[in-house]
């Protein structure tokens, strides 16, 4: 499992469901994750099973993310396939009190490095609501470029991507 300067990551387990429900229930957090319709306990139980199944199928998946300094879980992030296309997506979401502290960029970079170095991926995508400027600014800061606006789970979203070659060009060979 990867780690960054301030963050650790671990596989999600079925026992994480109550924490996941609590973390994603506030409106500021779930509004960019499909709202309460997609973040209710029943939907999250199904989603958690998908996250867990990705580990065995692909060797990576969405993970619990926590602070090394305290052990506190602060969100989820990871690499996973987009259900519609199979493209590998880097995703991240944080509890609101951990926003604007650089954790989004730190975890996204950690997963991009891992995807290109350890998983042999040639391209990674990211998806966000157009209104979620904080998320797509992280994508741009990581070197990802806008590709299109298209439907994702029936909702208009912006799609960004970065290739291994572009990542290495921006961040150097030491990142891989």
Describe every region a protein language model picked out.
Residues 1-32, 49-50, 62-176:
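Acyl-donor (CoA/ACP) binding surface of acyl/acetyltransferases
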Residues 39-58:
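Active-site rim helix/loop that mediates acceptor-substrate recognition in acyltransferases
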């Amino acid at each position: 499992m990867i780690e960054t300067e301030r963050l650790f990551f671990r596989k999600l387990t079925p026992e994480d469901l109550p924490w996941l429900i609590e973390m994603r229930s506030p409106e500021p957090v779930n509004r960019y994750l499909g709202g309460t319709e997609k973040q209710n306990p029943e939907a999250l139980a199904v989603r958690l099973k998908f996250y867990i199944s990705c580990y065995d199928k692909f060797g990576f998946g969405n993970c619990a993310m926590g602070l090394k300094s305290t052990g506190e879980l602060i969100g989820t992030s990871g690499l996973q396939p987009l259900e519609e296309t199979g493209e590998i997506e880097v995703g991240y979401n944080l509890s609101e009190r951990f926003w604007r502290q650089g954790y989004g960029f730190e975890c996204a970079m950690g997963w991009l490095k891992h995807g290109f170095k350890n998983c042999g991926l040639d391209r990674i995508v990211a998806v966000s609501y157009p209104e979620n400027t904080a998320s797509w600014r992280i994508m741009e800061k990581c070197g990802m470029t806008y590709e299109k606006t298209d439907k994702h789970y029936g909702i208009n979203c912006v799609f960004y991507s970065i290739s291994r070659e572009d990542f290495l060009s921006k961040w150097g060979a030491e990142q891989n």
